[in-house]
UniProtKB/Swiss-Prot annotation:
Range of residues in the leader sequence: 1-30
Main location: secreted
UniProt KW keywords: Collagen, Secreted, Signal
PANTHER family per the UniProt record, alphabetical: EMILIN ELASTIN MICROFIBRIL INTERFACE-LOCATED PROTEIN ELASTIN MICROFIBRIL INTERFACER, PROTEIN HP-25 HOMOLOG 2
Domain Collagen-like, chain residue ranges per copy: 43-76
Record GO cellular component, one term: collagen trimer
Bias kind Pro residues: ranges: 45-68
Positions of the UniProt region annotated as Disordered: 35-79
Protein name: Protein HP-25 homolog 2
Amino acid sequence: MPGRGGQSLSMVCVDVWILALSVLSVMADATSVPVTESCDSQGPPGLPGPPGLPGPPGPPGPPGPPGLRGPTGIPGDIESCLSPPKSAFAVKMNDPLPAPSQPIVFKEALHNDQDHFNLTTGVFTCTIPGVYRFGFDIELFQHAVKLGLMKNDTQILEKESKAKDNYRHLSGNVVLQLTLGDRVWLESKLDTTETEKGPIQSMFFGYLLYGNYPG
């Protein structure tokens, strides 16, 4: 039956052809290189992140070089230095003391450069207000002495001593605040009959410690 034989042959040929295509397809898959995407591909840049926290301060830098010398300054004003005021005296006498309740007149000046002590009246007059020191020294023999240091008719200090058959020494000093025109002197407080027995030597002194300056 030639019709069936030709049909069978055609089917065999088709199967062989399909088999051949399958083998070729398998071989092609085995030898083909898989296609992959490139690893070098990059997307678009992202948005900037927020600022970071400040870092700690760095160590101090080395000293810089010396600067240039500045210009010479303007000369200052020259003021004269005033010397402090002076007032001092020292007087003595070798005579008996005068009658009481009056200034003792000292006839010899050991120092009286400013003439603030009056040798005629025996009175010191303040011409520089300030703080003064006044004092006296008496050497006596067979005498009774009583002295008062006066300021403007007010007794500030009183001293007395008696020497029968020997020598005695009597001294006193005081610090006074004086204003312009104040007067200071030394006077006897005993009657002259009590002081005219033996020799006597008297010294009276005073000097400015410091003046009263404004401000």
